[in-house]
């Protein structure tokens, strides 16, 4: 019965509001928590953490234990797909991901070995789901193919994305095709191992406009959504095409996602008027980190705007590492009681 499902699953599947607005935060498990810093202090690199079953379970559950969030999101990274496809992914403290740049789709390995490589993550999903109470959702995720492609072609993050934008379009389509196929396999496995909801993080979607947005963001996302829903009809899938602006409307209408997470640059009144779909968002993480009083006022404004609509409270991007835990606690308390 749907009434027994977690609030976030119900909101998305029924397209109806919940009596209480549920809350979880992107990057809720991470460097803002002292228990996270203690748990990872003896690890040598970030990818080691991502492939450690016990650490992933512990880190995923930390914000549930501390803040009683309505959802846990599996502790992982969007570049797991790149790593499994044979890209040499390393994380450098203070810099971010460093990857040997891919110059051809032929450099990407076949995705047949996927389950073996990702088994620690999938096993962690199963363990978290068994330890999570029934009323809480477990969110699995992957990066949007365009975003993953832009990282592996650039060799990491970029301010200009000049390499990927100059990349041969036929070759780029082949890279995105391989990433899309691998993402489908990975997300279906996450669902089979216990994820209740999937989120697609297309963090670099805002770089593209018009026909390029259609080709590299909408098309692969639609393929992923169709493949998942072909196997799991009505499965809740949240899309997050960050910084897509008014293309959020095209995105949700054409991809078939079940809900959309909006970034903090999207005016909430515009979202309410134009995005007729369950919404998630969109408090600015900088406000939460550096101005608690202003963050609380803005959170009230967001809740008031979406009152009576299918809505999940979140940030417009991930929690910043130096966000005080008391600010997060105050936000959760506000959303619970407002």
Swiss-Prot record:
One of its GO terms (molecular function) is uroporphyrinogen decarboxylase activity. This is Uroporphyrinogen decarboxylase. Belongs to the uroporphyrinogen decarboxylase family. It catalyses: uroporphyrinogen III + 4 H(+) = coproporphyrinogen III + 4 CO2. The gene is hemE. It is found in: Cytoplasm. Homodimer. Catalyzes the decarboxylation of four acetate groups of uroporphyrinogen-III to yield coproporphyrinogen-III. Substrate binds at residues 27-31, 77, 151, 203, 317.
């Amino acid at each position: 019965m749907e009434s027994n499902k977690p609030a976030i699953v119900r909101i998305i599947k029924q397209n109806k509001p919940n009596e209480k607005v549920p809350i979880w935060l992107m990057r809720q498990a991470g460097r803002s928590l002292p228990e996270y810093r203690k748990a990872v202090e003896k690890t040598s690199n970030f990818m080691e953490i991502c492939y450690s079953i016990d650490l992933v379970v512990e880190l995923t559950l930390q914000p549930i234990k501390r803040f009683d969030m309505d959802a846990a999101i599996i502790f992982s990274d969007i570049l797991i797909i790149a790593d499994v496809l044979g890209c040499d992914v390393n994380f450098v403290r203070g810099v971010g991901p460093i990857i040997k740049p891919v110059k051809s789709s032929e450099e990407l390995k076949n995705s047949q070995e996927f389950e073996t490589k990702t088994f620690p993550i999938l096993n962690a999903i199963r363990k978290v789901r068994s330890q999570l109470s029934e009323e809480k959702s477990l969110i699995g995720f992957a990066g949007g193919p365009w975003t993953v492609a832009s990282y592996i072609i650039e060799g990491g993050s970029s301010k200009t994305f000049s390499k990927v934008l100059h990349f041969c379009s036929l070759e780029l389509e082949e890279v995105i095709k391989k990433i899309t196929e691998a993402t489908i396999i990975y997300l279906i496995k996450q669902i089979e191992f216990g994820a209740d909801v999937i989120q697609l993080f297309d963090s670099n979607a805002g770089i593209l406009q018009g026909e390029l947005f259609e080709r590299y963001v909408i098309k692969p996302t639609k393929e992923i959504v169709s493949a998942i829903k072909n196997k799991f009809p009505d499965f809740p899938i949240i899309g997050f095409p960050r910084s897509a602006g008014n293309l959020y409307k095209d995105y949700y209408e054409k991809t078939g996602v079940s809900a959309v997470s909006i970034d903090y640059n999207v005016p909430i009144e515009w979202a309410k008027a134009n995005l007729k779909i369950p919404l998630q968002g969109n408090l600015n993480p900088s406000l939460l980190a550096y101005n608690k009083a202003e963050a609380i006022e803005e959170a009230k404004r967001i809740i008031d705007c979406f009152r009576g609509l299918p809505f999940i409270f979140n940030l417009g991007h991930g929690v910043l590492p130096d966000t005080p835990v008391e600010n997060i606690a105050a936000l959760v308390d506000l959303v619970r009681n407002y």
